[in-house]
Amino acid sequence: MSGPQDILIGEDKLTEKCGVFGTFGASKEAARLAYYGLWALQHRGQESSGIASADTKNIYDHSDFGLVAHVYKDEDLSALHGHVSIGHNRYSTSGGRDACYNQPLINKDRTLAFAHNGNLPETHKLEKFLKKHKVEIGALNDSGMMAAAIEVYMQDGLTIEDAIEKSYPLFQGVFSALAMGKDRLVAFRDKFGIRPLSIAELDGGYVVSSETCAYDTIGAKF
């Protein structure tokens, strides 16, 4: 995307929310689909952009500060292998301008990638849970705490789906989120459905997005 609207970071109508996009089974180059999806969602966040992908063996990722068109080179996308991917355009609501807050977040074992749009104004229960499980929360924003809670249950042997179900009551706020493992993608949002998230079909697979405008870019059927 080009034009002056891309750099109006102070405009509320352009920077009030992040954008998330994910794809599963719609292409062997899922990261490229995520790139086009994030391009269409550029208006939802201009601070940073990131994509994570997986090929059943590994999780790969690339993120940086800036607009989608500037963050990814062709070689970056070529290095993001696999048939599943998630992407994120960030407008910060918590945390600061630090690379550690760029999303998708990847855990140390590289078994979980997490992208989140929303805000958790009440994190007392979540913080208490993480402290109980010896998770250092000092540098974590709400997105990081959500990912950490899911990882706690995954370390107990639960699948990503079950780990999300177990940790879901701890997430007090409004959000839409994507969690990706090496062979799966899970999309979920707050119980009131306040933050937008939809699903569409493409070439026998699925794509999910914060806004349906991203589907037009890649030809997905909503």
Q: What role is predicted for each listed range?
A:
Residues 1-222:
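Conserved short alpha-helical segments that host acidic/polar catalytic motifs at enzyme active sites
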